[in-house]
Amino acid sequence: ACTGSLVLLSGCTDSSPLPPMAEGEEVVVVTRNTPTTYYFESDRASGFEYELIRAFAREYNMLVRIKVAFSLPELFEMLASGEAHLAAAGLSQSAGRDAQFVASNPYLYQQPLVVYKSGALRPRSLDALAGRDIVVLAGSVHVETLSALQQDIPELAWREIHAADSLELMHLVTDETADLAIVDSIEFSIQQQLLPRVVAAMEIGDSTPN
């Protein structure tokens, strides 16, 4: 199964520091600095989701102001407090997020993966995750996935890492300070070029809409 990418809308409240989003005005977008969302190349802002936001802004004659969050919890806090109108950051859909934010239609799907260091013990089943040192991004839907699995595998445990993207998780696996990491397939396919010894062991959970 797979997940998809979404744009989340904050729905500014009366106490929000921002005026409501309106045609011809400024739209404030919170994102992450990752190769799949927003980054600088030769002093020029780029990234798939950044280009989507620019296209949206052009359609409604808006100016774009970007804010960068350094972890998913920070991103969601900025959105919930009204510091941004939108979040565009390679976000996946989940029941928890749907209860708090309004999401766009998904525009791509990606599969969560368990990854490990080549040459280390490869897990081949969900039960084999028990007793392993697993890392996930704090605030990610993978935390929800693992929490659900823990109902059937009580020995399952993990560490939540506050980082912008999965590259830090993969570094922990490469450095052997973690056994396994849960990452999304699209980020993994890009980041693996930097860390080729980190390889996919198996899929976990359903693919999610972004």
Predicted features along the sequence, with ranges:
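Short, well-ordered beta-strand segments
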Residues: 27-30, 115, 132-137, 181
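A ligand-binding cleft/hinge motif common to bilobed small-molecule-binding domains
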Residues: 73, 77-80, 88-100, 145-149, ...
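Short beta-strand->loop
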Residues: 40-41, 45, 132-139
